[in-house]
Each structure stands twice: as structure tokens, then as C-alpha cells.
Amino acid sequence: MSKVKSITRESWILSTFPEWGSWLNEEIEQEQVAPGTFAMWWLGCTGIWLKSEGGTNVCVDFWCGTGKQSHGNPLMKQGHQMQRMAGVKKLQPNLRTTPFVLDPFAIRQIDAVLATHDHNDHIDVNVAAAVMQNCADDVPFIGPKTCVDLWIGWGVPKERCIVVKPGDVVKVKDIEIHALDAFDRTALITLPADQKAAGVLPDGMDDRAVNYLFKTPGGSLYHSGDSHYSNYYAKHGNEHQIDVALGSYGENPRGITDKMTSADMLRMGEALNAKVVIPFHHDIWSNFQADPQEIRVLWEMKKDRLKYGFKPFIWQVGGKFTWPLDKDNFEYHYPRGFDDCFTIEPDLPFKSFL
């Protein structure tokens, strides 16, 4: 059979997806985290892989799904949180713009799976399945009640799940995980389609969403999930030492407030008394596309006058950030390679070819 006749859509997908294959899985496994540091990788959206100096591996909000894929239905799903928020009827054009950089089914070494809340782009059945099938049988699944309900519904044993609410602390080897208040107002209007939000007192945020503070021997990481800006960030900053803070940033469409703005990101960094502030979530949805350089420009305008004690860092999906080695850097660039140039003799017709 000729090659063009043997190739199918399925063979094409299997040969190209996930786009990074197991490259990042291998990089994370091989990483030796130095004492006094921690390393983390951005998995897309708010997905983070954190590795401590003791070799403890945890992932948060690792999501392997996609967005809109067809114009077939021009209408938004009835009762969707964005419909409730803005009174819209048209389909939200939220296409996934980020490649899949980590293969969940190539994960072998992991010590905990966490989720901040139960929105589709923050918790994933494929990740749960991969960990259940391929990893140790005591890896815990940690999250607020709504997330645990999802995991159990997917088939994760109840005894493998840990429900957390603000104030709870869970120890996973050398990482101390503090569950803190979340400020995700969108989560409170994520309801069954037949349930009305108008005129009804929302249920408690604590069952739906949490923020996390990861305290490692080498430093601390604050993960804010999908939280909006809140003055209560200052309380978290008063009560905890926060080295690196991650915030959900994006360009909100007309009539929508779902992501923090550049000004919100700076206010969050100041309130938390963080050393480094990193935007995420802006990478994933086409209709929330935002330029993170705006954060740095605004920071440059304000830093001297307001005496900011933090710096912004502009990351790339799949990239690594090491605290405190990268604390004075402003931007990430993927490894460029070719550091071993001219270690062997070039094979060229003549030197002037160079």
C-alpha cells in the first residue's frame, strides 16, 4: 500500500500529539533541584508542576482539554457562567492557543495531584486516569469539595482524596501545602443549567475553590487559581512569607470581568508582599488574549514611586522557573541550544562558508 493511502487522520494525530511528546516529562524527571531552591514548570493555563529540593513532585490544575472546535452550534450553553455574568447568547469563541507540553500518560513520579476549583480548564479526567493507571497507588488527590466530588465521580477511590478548605494544611513529603481563601466570583455562579442565580444567596466559596501556598525548604509559591483581585490578598501577605506569586491575567472581553488586569497583578504582588509576580492563564484562551508586557510597562512606571518590593516575570508555557536563581530575571526564553558549537570540526567546503 502506498504511504499516502496508509495514512489516516488517527495516525496523523498519534504521530503529532501531544506536540512535545515526553520531552518535558523527561526534563522534569531528570531535574536535580539544588538545596535552597525549588523548580517549577508552566503546563499551560494555570497548570504548574512543582519540584522541591527533596525531589517531591506535585502538580496543580494540570488540564489536558481543549476549547471550541466547531462553529456547529452558534449559541452558548444554557446557564453557562459567562451567560449569567453578561447576559449573552452567542457562542464564546474561546479556542485553545497553547500546545500540550506534558504527556499525562508518561507521568511516573508524582506525589500529589491538586486542583484549585472544578472549572473544566483546571481539573482533568485524563490526568486522574493516567495517575491512577501508571503511578504509585497512594498518590493523593487534593482539592476543595467540588473537585473531590468530581474525582470520586470519575472513579478515583474516596480514600485517595483529601478535601481541603481555607486554613487546612497538608504535608506531602518536604512540601507543606496551605489551603487559603479563594476569590473566584465566577465559581459562585457556576451552577446547573436549570438553577437560577438571580436573587439567590450564593453558597460558600470554601467548598468550591481554594488558593494554595506551597512552602518548600527552598522557598514558597502562592497559586491563586482563577481568583480575581481581592483586598484579602494583603491578609495572606501579612500571615505568610511569599516568594513567588502566580495570578490569572487576561484581557477581559466587553461586559466580562473574569481575569485580573495588569493593574490588578501589581496590586496583588504588593498586597502579598511577594518577591516575584508571574502572570498565567493569559496563554490559553484566544478571546482573553493579553500581552503580559503590559504588566512590566506599568511596573516600570510605578516601581520607584510606590517602592515596589517585587518584580514581574514573563514566562512561556513549558518553561522552567527556579527560585531564587531566576528572581532577578524579567523574561523567560526557551533554551537556544548550540552551546557546544565547534567542539568538532565543521564539515564545510571552505571556512568562508561560515
From Swiss-Prot:
GO terms for biological process: L-ascorbic acid catabolic process. This is Probable L-ascorbate-6-phosphate lactonase UlaG. The keyword Transmembrane does not apply. It catalyses: L-ascorbate 6-phosphate + H2O = 3-dehydro-L-gulonate 6-phosphate. Induction: Induced by L-ascorbate. Repressed by UlaR. One of its GO terms (molecular function) is L-ascorbate 6-phosphate lactonase activity. The lineage of its organism: Bacteria, Pseudomonadati, Pseudomonadota, Gammaproteobacteria, Enterobacterales. It holds the Pfam family Lactamase_B_2. The keyword Cytoplasm applies.
